[in-house]
Amino acid sequence: MLATDSDPIVAIATAAGRGGIGVVRVSFGRGGEAAALPLIDALCGQKLAPRHASYVPFLDAHGAPLDRGIALYFPAPHSYTGEHVLELQGHGGPIVMQLLLQRCLDAGRGFGLRLAEPGEFTRRAFLNDKLDLAQAEAVADLIEASTEAAARSAGRSLDGAFSRQIHALVDDVITLRMLVEATLDFPEEEIDFLEAADARGKLAKIRAQLAHVLGDARQGALLREGLSVVLAGQPNVGKSSLLNALAGAELAIVTPIAGTTRDKVAQTIQVEGIPLHIIDTAGLRETEDEVERIGIARTWSEIERADVVLHLLDSRTGMTPDDETIAARFPAGVPVVRVLNKTDLTGVPACVEHPAAEGDLTEVHLSAKRGDGIDMLRAELLRIAGWQAGAEGVYLARERHLIALRAAQEHLAQAADHAEQRAQSLDLFAEELRLAQEQLNAITGEFTSDDLLGVIFSRFCIGK
C-alpha cells in the first residue's frame, strides 16, 4: 500500500461549473474520528448524527457562514471509502465550492488533510474491500457512459453481476485444483481422486462457462468502447452525405465540388445502444494542394486505427482503377465494407450483398441522399461488430478484462491437453489451473500490481 493511501483527503465531488447543488467530500483516512469530529465542529458548529442529514451553516474561520446546506457524517466502516467520511452539500456555484474546499483544507491542516487525486476515493473503497476492482472500474464507466444501454450495463457491473460470474469461475477452478493437488500429494492411495470426481467433466464445464462469460464480456466491451467507423473513398462519392444520413443531421458540408472535406468530421451515433464513432475524411486522390494533402495523410492515419472502413464508391461507375489503388492500401487487419452510393441515380434497389467467395467484400447498395439502405448499413455494422441483438443482462467490460479472460481460456485449454496425458503431465495440469485462476483473480483485483491500480484510478475524475 502506498503511504499516501492513508492520508486524509478532500475534493469537490460534483462536476465543474454552476449547478443547483455542489458537494465537497472528505475521507479522513488514518485520522479517523479524532480528525473528523474537530473538522465537523469547525465547519458546522455542532455535532452531526451519523448517517442523518443535517441542515447547517458552513462556517469560515471567523464563524461567519460561507453557505448553508446539508451535512452528512458517515463513521467507518459504513461509508463509500470504508473510512470516516464527511459530505457537505451546498449551492453549486464554483466560487462557493472553492471557498468551502479551501476552508476544509485550512481547518484540516493540523492532521494533514490534502487534495484528493483522481479516483482516490474509489481507490480507497477498493483497498478497504467496499468494492472489487471490476466494480470500481464500473463507477468510472457509469459516469462516462455515452448510451442508455452502456449506463445500464455499467450499473449491473457496479452491482456485482460481472464479479459474481468471475468468482463462480474461480471457485470452480479452486475445487478442481484441490482434486489435482490431492492426487499429487497422495500418489500411493488407491483412490483416484480425479477419476472419482470426474475432473475432466468439471474442467469441460468450467471451459464452457468461461466461454459464455467471455461472450458477454465482448458485448459489454462493445457497449463501452463502441465502434470506430471511417468513411473513405475518392472525392465526391458521398462520404459527407452518408455521415449526415447516419447521424440524422447536417454535420458535414455537402457540395458537388470535389475536395470539400479537407479534415475529418466526427460524430458518435447510437445503434441499439452501441456507440458508433463515424469519421468522415478527406477524399483520397493525387493533389498538389498542400492543405488537402495534409487532410489525406490524416485520412490514412484514421484508416489505420479504424475498427471498420466503409469504402465508398459511386454506383454509376463502380470500382474504378483509382478505387482499386485505394483498396490495395487498406490495412489487412481492418474489416472493409464496400458501399455503392447514389443508387437514386442508377435505379438499383438498396440491398446488402454478402461475399460469395472467401476474400470478397460485403457490398451495400444505398442512397445517402434519399436514405435508402441506411438501416441495412447500420445492421451490417452491428453484424461486423459481433453485437447480439436483444442481449439481456450484459455487463460492461474493459479490454483488460477481455485479455485476462482469453488468457484464462488458453490456460484451461492447455490444462485439458495435460489431463488427457494424465500420468506424464499432472504437474503441468495443476500449473495451468493455477495460472488460469491468477488471470481471473486479476479481473476483480485479488491479484493485481500496484502499477495497474495506479493506471486504472488515475483515469477517474477528481472527487470520485
UniProtKB/Swiss-Prot annotation:
Pfam families: MMR_HSR1, MnmE_helical, TrmE_N. It is found in: Cytoplasm. Keywords: Cytoplasm, GTP-binding, Hydrolase, Magnesium, Metal-binding, Nucleotide-binding, Potassium, tRNA processing. The keyword Transferase does not apply. Mg(2+) binds at residues 240, 261. GO terms for cellular component: cytosol. Gene3D superfamilies: P-loop containing nucleotide triphosphate hydrolases, Probable tRNA modification gtpase trme, domain 1, tRNA modification GTPase MnmE domain 2. K(+) binds at residues 236, 255, 257, 260. Binds 1 potassium ion per subunit. Its cofactor is K(+). Its main location: cytoplasm. (6S)-5-formyl-5,6,7,8-tetrahydrofolate binds at residues 25, 87, 130, 464. The keyword Metal-binding applies. It comes from the Bacteria. GO terms for biological process: tRNA methylation; tRNA wobble uridine modification. Residues 226-386 form the TrmE-type G domain. NCBIfam families: mnmE_trmE_thdF (TIGR00450), PRK05291.1-3 (NF003661), small_GTP (TIGR00231). Belongs to the TRAFAC class TrmE-Era-EngA-EngB-Septin-like GTPase superfamily. TrmE GTPase family. Exhibits a very high intrinsic GTPase hydrolysis rate. Involved in the addition of a carboxymethylaminomethyl (cmnm) group at the wobble position (U34) of certain tRNAs, forming tRNA-cmnm(5)s(2)U34. Homodimer. Heterotetramer of two MnmE and two MnmG subunits. PANTHER family: TRNA MODIFICATION GTPASE GTPBP3, TRNA MODIFICATION GTPASE GTPBP3, MITOCHONDRIAL. This is tRNA modification GTPase MnmE. It comes from Burkholderia orbicola (strain MC0-3). The lineage of its organism: Bacteria, Pseudomonadati, Pseudomonadota, Betaproteobacteria, Burkholderiales. The gene is mnmE.
